[in-house]
UniProtKB/Swiss-Prot annotation:
CDD domains registered for this protein in UniProt: ABC_MutS1
Gene name in the database record: mutS
GO cellular component, one term: cytosol
Record's keyword annotation contains ATP-binding: yes
Organism name: Paraburkholderia phymatum (strain DSM 17167 / CIP 108236 / LMG 21445 / STM815)
Protein name as it appears in the record: DNA mismatch repair protein MutS
Length: 892
């Protein structure tokens, strides 16, 4: 059987079990089916081949079905999470098919069904999720105008682990920026139209696994109704979503898919947030990468702004930090409220100290995700004990906040939200054992005293030992057999063992159970009755405990909203405490905000770089309506890019609500932050470095407003000198004359330093350096005025460029400077070079003859040992070297 399709072509040819498997597989095409068989999950046919390749499993063939061998691969059920994690990371989806029938009573194959589908965007199990980042499932629905052109894209995304659902509608060219901000793990799209359709639209690639679902899933009317049903409301006006038709269509597909993967209702999805582009400071994908907010340019998690700020005591706080960094609000009142809370935490009295608060927060579990699993009825016993212990710890935490509630409104709100649901705490305390087993199947989960029947069954199982001791004592006295023993094993159950020399004393009511070489084992009616009762008691206790646990999960469902309220407050408090800790430890200050446009930073520092070096040089940055653009010149490695990035990061941190690394800082309104810093070829997209650079520049020129902050670093590279200079000049003029944005413009084109003479709103600043011999010392200080040179040759020398190349470069630099001082030289093509350059060059690659003569002299000198030379020998050697110097090949 070569393929899955072939296997399913004639299902009647297969064995009953394989018929069952093929029916289930047919309901989940494109998904790996984990088919439970005893203690293993088995995969068959194509699934087995694929899983064996991806998971490094052994592929076997066992038996035949339909006349063909059955390819198999399997994983043990107790280790399934680690295999699921690998598959999900590779973008695969897995259908978990469990045995739901009783093998003892089943006629034919045991009944099985898919209980859940694990996909990259629908993870809830702690073993499959990243602790410090959210996992989102996103659906995209395109809206067309009358000509069939896509004009709007509706987005709906869900964090299934927490129940957070959000909607937005964006223009088609803004979808990539939205996906970069959300970073979904899985994207749902409608089945693609014909590729020949001129109006066809597709989601940008590279943002998560893509799953195609039928087009009718995105029906707007059905999606709107499904959304209303999910939120238990009559309409969406209260959420501000009534006019977002495309987003509602996306939400309908999203909810349908998520519920199908879980096999049940999404009880914890009871709220909706509509996101508008105007709410947040715009950060395009390039800006998020260049500022290294949550990921370095090398793709690592550290060192980044997020890794520096993340001293959170809970994983809930860490996830909220990432969300805040990618969603800085434009409205400064949000930042001011957060900074007010940070100030209150820093000024807290001893009984409510920041250290004590952090100590209490460290005892808190991730109840946000526990609540999600509780709503999906997949919470495990230790989830419930963690939830209980967290609720029990809340009164102490709330008591520490009481002295601070008057100093910050947000802390008063958090204090009120941390009130635990009393009935839920009582139920968990009564029902769950202090230290429950990891899985309900292991028993020991339900607390003693919660259920009388369970306690009785446990007593029977646990009192076996005493019964056996008593029985053994009585039987020894009754039979006179002093070495008689009453024991138990899993194969034969309970038995009475008598050695062969004592078997003549065995009473008539003993029935032989097993014969050994030196002993006989017996069973009595009394022992048999006890055996039946004891063995069935353990089995019945586990069954009773499972039923009680399932009922307990149902009883906890009404408290989902309360649990979510507490989790949200804990995450916010934890993050504010982390901000306060960073401000105290790193000497940060609270920024100011004003309605007047501009940025005024005194002694600002790059937060991440400062943490990596022993000493950091702080610098000022002033941008205002009279000083819109700073032309930044100076040497490579002098700190231009660091200065630009630190300005953007300090502004971003201020609007996020953190204190900032500066002596003083003030900010006017900021609507977007753009960066054009560094570039690389986009090989997959067929774009050169220069094309990438110009594309980013075009986006800035088209979208930047007077309230935007723009960072441009060395624009114009990658083409001829004059072309690059002309473009850089024109771009700078356009930013000043048309965009009017606040701009930091780093360049090595010194001709641009004349721009302030034409535009008074531009100013020159430079990064200073000092030459020392042929070397250079970077001062990293920003000073007013233009730089006098770039120190490119000195930097090249520091990088290890051979001295011969440096010498040749110096000579050619002198030639170029001489040319520029006189008549302008024509712009040369790629293969032209000035004749003077070739005539005057002393580079070994240009003048090999010179190198050969020099080499002869050097080799002769190297062969000489001065310590062995007599006076006469030294004189002869001097004549020899003199003759070599007079040779035609010697340098003149």
């Amino acid at each position: 059987m070569g393929t899955q399709t072939a296997a399913a072509s004639d299902i009647a040819q297969h064995t009953p079990m394989m018929q069952q498997y093929l029916r289930i597989k047919g309901e989940h095409p494109g998904t790996l089916v984990f088919y439970r068989m005893g203690d293993f999950y088995e995969l068959f046919f194509d699934d087995a081949e694929k899983a064996a390749r991806l998971l490094d499993l052994t592929l076997t063939q066992r038996g035949a079905s339909g006349g063909n061998p059955i390819k198999m691969a399997g994983v043990p059920h107790h280790a399934v999470e680690q295999y699921l994690a690998k598959l999900v990371k590779l973008g695969e989806s897995v259908a978990i098919c469990e045995q739901i029938g009783d093998p003892a009573t089943s006629k034919g194959p045991v009944e099985r069904k898919v209980v859940r589908v694990v996909t990259p965007g629908t993870l809830t199990d702690a073993a499959l999720l990243s602790d410090k980042s959210d996992t989102y499932l996103l659906a995209a629905c395109a809206g067309h105008n009358r000509r069939g052109v896509v004009t709007t894209v509706g987005l709906a995304w869900l964090n299934l682990a927490s129940g957070a659902l959000r909607l937005a509608e964006v223009a088609p060219d803004q979808v990539a920026a939205a996906l970069e901000r959300i970073r979904p793990a899985e994207i749902l799209v409608a089945d693609a139209p014909s590729s020949s359709d001129a109006n066809a639209w597709s989601v940008p690639t590279g943002f998560g696994a893509t799953t195609r679902v039928p087009l009718w899933h995105f029906d707007v009317a059905s999606g709107t109704q499904r959304l209303c049903d999910q939120l238990e409301v009559a309409g969406l006006d209260g959420f501000g979503a009534h006019s977002l038709t495309c987003a509602c269509g996306a939400a309908g597909a999203l909810l349908l898919y998520a519920a199908a993967t879980q096999g049940q209702q999404l009880r914890h999805v009871r709220s909706l947030k509509v996101e508008y582009e105007s709410e947040y400071i715009g950060l395009d994908p390039s800006t998020r990468r260049n500022l290294e907010l949550t990921e370095t340019l090398r793709g690592t998690d550290s060192p980044t702004l997020c890794s520096l700020l993340d001293t959170c005591c809970t994983t809930m706080g860490s996830r909220l930090l990432r969300h805040w960094l990618h969603h800085p609000p434009r409205d400064a009142s949000f930042a001011q409220a957060r900074q007010q809370a940070i100030g209150a935490l820093l000024d807290s009295p001893p009984q409510a100290s920041l250290d004590a608060l952090c100590g209490a927060l460290r005892q808190i579990s991730d109840i946000e995700r526990i609540t999600g699993r509780l709503a999906l009825l997949s919470a495990r016993p230790r989830d419930l004990s963690s939830l209980r212990d967290t609720f029990i710890a809340l009164p102490e935490l709330r008591a520490q906040l009481v002295p601070l509630t008057g100093a910050a409104d947000s802390l008063a709100r958090i204090h009120a939200s941390l009130e635990p649901p009393a009935d839920c705490v009582d139920l968990l305390t009564r029902a769950v054992a202090q230290e429950p087993a990891a899985m309900i199947r292991d028993g020991g989960v339900i607390a003693r005293g919660y259920d009388v029947d369970l306690d009785e069954l446990r007593d029977i199982s646990e009192n076996c030992g005493q019964f056996l001791i008593d029985l053994e004592t009585r039987e020894r006295a009754r039979t006179g057999i002093g070495n008689l023993r009453v024991e138990y094993n899993k194969v034969h159950g309970f038995y009475i063992e008598v050695t062969r020399g004592q078997t003549d004393k065995v009473p008539d009511d003993y029935r032989r159970r097993q014969t050994l070489k030196n002993a006989e084992r017996y069973i009595t009616p009394e022992l048999k009755t006890f055996e039946d009762k004891a063995l069935s008691a353990q089995e019945r206790a586990l069954a009773r405990e499972k039923a009680l646990y399932d009922a307990l999960l149902q009883s906890l469902l009404p408290f989902i909203a309360d649990c979510q309220r507490v989790a949200s407050a804990l995450a916010e408090l934890d993050l504010l405490a982390a901000f306060a800790e960073r401000a105290r430890a790193l000497d940060w200050v609270a920024p100011n905000f004003s309605a007047t446009g501009g940025i005024d930073i005194e002694q600002g520092r790059h937060p991440v770089v400062e943490a990596q070096v022993e000493q950091f040089i702080a610098n000022d940055c002033m941008l205002n309506p009279e000083r819109k653009l700073l032309l930044i010149t100076g040497p490579n490695m002098g700190g231009k890019s660091t200065f630009m990035r630190q300005t953007a990061l300090i502004a971003l941190m201020a609007y996020v609500g953190s204190y900032v690394p500066a002596r003083r800082a003030s900010f006017g309104p900021i609507d977007r932050i753009f960066t054009r810093i560094g570039a690389a070829d986009d090989l997959a997209g067929g774009r050169s470095t220069f094309m990438v650079e110009m594309t980013e520049a075009a986006a800035i020129l088209n979208d930047a407003t007077p309230q935007s902050l723009v960072l441009m670093d060395e624009i114009g590279r990658g083409t001829s000198t004059f072309d690059g200079l002309a473009l850089a000049w024109a771009i700078a003029r356009h930013l000043l004359a048309h965009n009017g944005c606040h701009t930091l413009f780093a360049t090595h084109y010194f001709e641009l330093t004349q721009l302030p003479a034409e535009f008074p709103h531009a100013a020159n600043v430079h990064l200073s350096a000092v030459e020392h011999g042929h070397g250079i010392v970077f001062l990293h200080a920003v000073n007013e005025g233009p730089a006098n040179q770039s120190y490119g040759l000195q930097v090249a020398q520091l990088a290890g460029v051979p001295n011969a190349v440096i010498r040749a470069a110096r000579k050619h630099l002198a030639y170029l400077e001489q040319q520029s001082a006189g008549a302008p030289a024509p712009q040369l093509d790629l293969f032209s070079a000035p004749v003077a350059m070739l005539e005057d060059a002393d580079d070994e690659s240009i003048a090999p003859a010179l190198d050969a003569a020099t080499r002869t002299l050097v080799e002769r000198l190297r062969d000489i040992d001065p310590n062995d030379l007599r006076p006469r020998d030294a004189l002869d050697l001097l004549y020899e070297l003199h003759e070599l110097a007079k040779s035609p090949d010697a340098p003149r």
